[in-house]
């Protein structure tokens, strides 16, 4: 079965510039480890920049990385999980990317 790497970018602050509560990251981590058995986190934040309605926004983000078998059930999990993350982190969009990987 082929594997994919999933990268999730989660904001450290809400859109009103208040800090996201640590419990929300902990809950996300628990869910992913419970579902897939492992998780990697890039602890130093990455910076992001985006434009909406002519206004420029900057984000500080944490990256969660999960490697998992590419199955229809995995795809369904990510679609549902993304919607929960959008609510949890009060975001219009949460960026989750997937790409094939080969384990050696």
Where on the chain are the PLM-derived regions?
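Positively charged, small/polar-rich N-terminal and surface patches that mediate targeting and assembly
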Residues: 1-104
């Amino acid at each position: 079965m082929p594997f994919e790497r999933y990268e999730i970018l989660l904001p450290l602050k809400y859109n009103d510039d208040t800090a996201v509560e640590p419990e929300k990251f902990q809950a996300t981590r628990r869910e992913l480890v419970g579902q897939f058995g492992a998780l990697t986190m890039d602890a130093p934040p990455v910076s992001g920049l985006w434009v909406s309605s002519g206004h420029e926004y900057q984000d500080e983000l944490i990256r969660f990385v999960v490697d998992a078998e590419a199955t229809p059930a995995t795809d369904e999990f990510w679609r549902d999980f993304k919607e929960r993350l959008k609510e949890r982190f009060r975001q219009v969009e949460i960026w989750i990317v997937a790409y094939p990987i080969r384990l050696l």
